C-alpha cells in the first residue's frame, strides 16, 4: 500500500507540467497524460488544424479494486500451504498484520495530508494561471476587436489624405507644365519674331549702307559739279575778259578806223563794214553768253534736283534708321523682360519640383513608417495569439491534471470511507501472480480535442473521448 502511494506521490502535476513526466512501471495506477501537439500553421497558410490527445489510465479490480489491491499487497506474506482457504489465522499473526496495517494507515494519512497541502498550493497556482489566462484572453480580444480596426482606420485615413495631396500636387504640376509649355511656345514665337526683326534690321542696315554709298556718290557728284561750276564761272569770267578785251581792241580799231575814215573821207564803205563787223561780234557774244547762261542754269538746276533728291532719300533713310533703332530697342527690352520672366518661372518650377520631391519623399517615409508600425502590430498580435495558444494548451493540460487528481481523491475518499473489517473475521487467501494479473485490468480513456484555426483565430473546436479496457 505504501509503495502504491509512493508511486502515486511521484505522479505530481507540478512535475508532469514543469519537470517532465516520470516513467512509470507497467501496471502502475496512473499513467502520465500524453499531450501530442500538432504544429501551428506557418505564416501565410489559410488555415490549420491542431489536435491534442489526452490519455488517462485508471486501474480497477475485477471484483473490487481495493480488495484486489489489498489482497495483492497482503498476498506477499507467505502462508503455509497446510492452511486451507477459509481457515482463520492465529492471533499473533493477526496482531502483527494489524500493527503493520495501522502503521501503514498512519503513514498514508501523513502522505495524504502532504498531498492535500501540495494539491491546495497547486489549486492556488491554477487559479492564478487561470486569472492570467483570462486577462491575456481579454487583452487578445481587445486587440482583435479594437486595436487593428483603429490602426487600419488611421492608416486608411492617412493614406487617403496622402493620396489626395499627391493628386493635388499632380494637378498643380500638370498646370505648371502647361504654363511652362505655353511660356516655351511664347518664347519660341518671340525668338522667331526677334529673328525676323534682326533680319529686317540687317536689311535696313544694308539699305542704309547702300543709301550711304548713294549719298557719298551724290556728294562726290555735287562736289564735282560745284568744281565744274567754278571752272565754268572762271571760264565765263575769262571769256568775258577776253570778250571785253576784244571789244576794247575792236573799239580801239574802230576808233583808229574812224580816225582814218575821218582822215580819209574818200572811203565811206569802211565805216559801214566796221559797223557790220561790230554788230556781228556783238550778236555772237550775246549768243555765246546766253548759251553759257542757259547751260549753267540747266546744270545748276539738275544738280540742285539731284541734291534735293539725295537729301530726301538720306533724310528718309535716317528716319527709317531711327525707327528701326527704336524698334530694336523696344524688342530688346521686351526680350530682356521675357528672359527675366522665363528665368523666374524656371526658378519657380525648379523650386516647386524640389518641394514636390521633398514632400513626396516625406510621404513615402510616412507610408513606410505606418507600414512598419502595422507590421509591428501584426507581429505583436501574432505573438499574443501564440502566447494565448500556449496558455490555452497549459490550461487544458492543467484541466486534465485537475480531473486526474479529482479521480484520485474520489478513489482515496471512497477507500477511506470503507468500513474496517475485523481482522479476526478476515479470511486471507494466497493468490498467484497469474490470478492477480487476471483480476487487475486497466481502463484507458483517450480524449481527442481538435481545434481548427485560421489566420491565428479559433474557428471550431471538437472533443471526442474513447474508452479502452486493457
Curated annotation (Swiss-Prot):
Residues 109-141 are annotated as: Coil 1A. InterPro entries: IF_conserved, IF_rod_dom, Intermed_filament_DNA-bd, Intermediate_filament. Keywords: ADP-ribosylation, Cell membrane, Coiled coil, Cytoplasm, Intermediate filament, Membrane, Methylation, Muscle protein, Nucleus, Phosphoprotein, Ubl conjugation. One of its GO terms (molecular function) is structural constituent of cytoskeleton. Residues 152-252 are annotated as: Coil 1B. Residues 268-415 are annotated as: Interaction with NEB. The modification Omega-N-methylarginine is found at residues 16, 37, 70. Residues 269-287 are annotated as: Coil 2A. Residues 288-295 are annotated as: Linker 2. ADP-ribosylation prevents ability to form intermediate filaments. Phosphorylation at Ser-7, Ser-28 and Ser-32 by CDK1 and phosphorylation at Ser-60 by AURKB contribute to efficient separation of desmin intermediate filaments during mitosis. One of its GO terms (cellular component) is intercalated disc. Residues 438-453 are annotated as: Interaction with CRYAB. It is found in: Cytoplasm, Myofibril, Sarcomere, Z line; Cytoplasm; Cell membrane, Sarcolemma; Nucleus. SMART domains: Filament. Residues 413-470 are annotated as: Tail. One of its GO terms (biological process) is nuclear envelope organization. Residues 108-416 form the IF rod domain. Signal peptide: none annotated. The record marks 354 as: Stutter. Residues 296-412 are annotated as: Coil 2B. Residues 2-108 are annotated as: Head. The modification Asymmetric dimethylarginine is found at residue 37. Muscle-specific type III intermediate filament essential for proper muscular structure and function. Plays a crucial role in maintaining the structure of sarcomeres, inter-connecting the Z-disks and forming the myofibrils, linking them not only to the sarcolemmal cytoskeleton, but also to the nucleus and mitochondria, thus providing strength for the muscle fiber during activity. In adult striated muscle they form a fibrous network connecting myofibrils to each other and to the plasma membrane from the periphery of the Z-line structures. Belongs to the intermediate filament family. Homomer. Interacts with DST. Interacts with MTM1. Interacts with EPPK1; interaction is dependent of higher-order structure of intermediate filament. Interacts with CRYAB. Interacts with NEB (via nebulin repeats 160-164). Interacts (via rod region) with NEBL (via nebulin repeats 1-5). Interacts with ASB2; the interaction targets DES for proteasomal degradation. Interacts with PKP1. Interacts with FLII. This is Desmin. It comes from Bos taurus.
Amino acid at each position: 500500500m505504501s509503495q502504491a502511494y509512493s508511486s502515486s506521490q511521484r505522479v505530481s502535476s507540478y512535475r508532469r507540467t514543469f519537470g517532465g513526466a516520470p516513467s512509470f512501471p507497467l501496471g502502475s495506477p496512473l499513467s502520465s497524460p500524453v499531450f501530442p501537439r500538432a504544429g501551428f500553421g506557418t505564416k501565410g497558410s489559410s488555415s490549420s488544424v491542431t489536435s491534442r490527445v489526452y490519455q488517462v489510465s485508471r486501474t480497477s479490480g475485477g471484483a473490487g479494486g481495493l480488495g484486489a489491491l489489498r489482497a495483492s499487497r497482503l498476498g506477499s506474506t507467505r502462508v503455509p500451504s497446510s492452511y486451507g482457504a477459509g481457515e482463520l489465522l492465529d492471533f499473533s499473526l493477526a496482531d502483527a498484520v494489524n500493527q503493520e496495517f495501522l502503521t501503514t494507515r498512519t503513514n498514508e494519512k501523513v502522505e495524504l495530508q502532504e498531498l492535500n497541502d501540495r494539491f491546495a498550493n497547486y489549486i492556488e497556482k491554477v487559479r492564478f494561471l487561470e486569472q492570467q489566462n483570462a486577462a491575456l484572453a481579454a487583452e487578445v480580444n481587445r486587440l482583435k476587436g479594437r486595436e487593428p480596426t483603429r490602426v487600419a482606420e488611421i492608416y486608411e485615413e492617412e493614406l487617403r489624405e496622402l493620396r489626395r495631396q499627391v493628386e493635388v500636387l499632380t494637378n498643380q504640376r500638370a498646370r505648371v507644365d502647361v504654363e511652362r509649355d505655353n511660356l516655351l511656345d511664347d518664347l519660341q514665337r518671340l525668338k522667331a519674331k526677334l529673328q525676323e526683326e534682326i533680319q529686317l534690321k540687317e536689311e535696313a542696315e544694308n539699305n542704309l549702307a547702300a543709301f550711304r554709298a548713294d549719298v557719298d556718290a551724290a556728294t562726290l557728284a555735287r562736289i564735282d559739279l560745284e568744281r565744274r561750276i567754278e571752272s565754268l564761272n572762271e571760264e565765263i569770267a575769262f571769256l568775258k575778259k577776253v570778250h571785253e578785251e576784244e571789244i576794247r581792241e575792236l573799239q580801239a580799231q574802230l576808233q583808229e578806223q574812224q580816225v582814218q575814215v575821218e582822215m580819209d573821207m574818200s572811203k565811206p564803205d569802211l565805216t559801214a563794214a566796221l559797223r557790220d563787223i561790230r554788230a556781228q561780234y556783238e550778236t555772237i557774244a550775246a549768243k555765246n553768253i546766253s548759251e553759257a547762261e542757259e547751260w549753267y542754269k540747266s546744270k545748276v538746276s539738275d544738280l540742285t534736283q539731284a541734291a534735293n533728291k539725295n537729301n530726301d532719300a538720306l533724310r528718309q533713310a535716317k528716319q527709317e534708321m531711327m525707327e528701326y533703332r527704336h524698334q530694336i530697342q523696344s524688342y530688346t527690352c521686351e526680350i530682356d523682360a521675357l528672359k527675366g520672366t522665363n528665368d523666374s518661372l524656371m526658378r519657380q518650377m525648379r523650386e516647386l519640383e524640389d518641394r514636390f520631391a521633398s514632400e513626396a519623399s516625406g510621404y513615402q517615409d510616412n507610408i513606410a513608417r505606418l507600414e512598419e508600425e502595422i507590421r509591428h502590430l501584426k507581429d505583436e498580435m501574432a505573438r499574443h495569439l501564440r502566447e494565448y495558444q500556449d496558455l490555452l494548451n497549459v490550461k487544458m493540460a492543467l484541466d486534465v491534471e485537475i480531473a486526474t487528481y479529482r479521480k484520485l481523491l474520489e478513489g482515496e475518499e471512497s477507500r477511506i470511507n470503507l468500513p474496517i473489517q475485523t481482522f479476526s473475521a478476515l479470511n486471507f487467501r494466497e493468490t498467484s501472480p497469474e490470478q492477480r494479473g487476471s483480476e487487475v485490468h486497466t481502463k484507458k480513456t483517450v480524449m481527442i480535442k481538435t481545434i481548427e484555426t485560421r489566420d491565428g483565430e479559433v474557428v471550431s473546436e471538437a472533443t471526442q473521448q474513447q474508452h479502452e479496457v486493457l
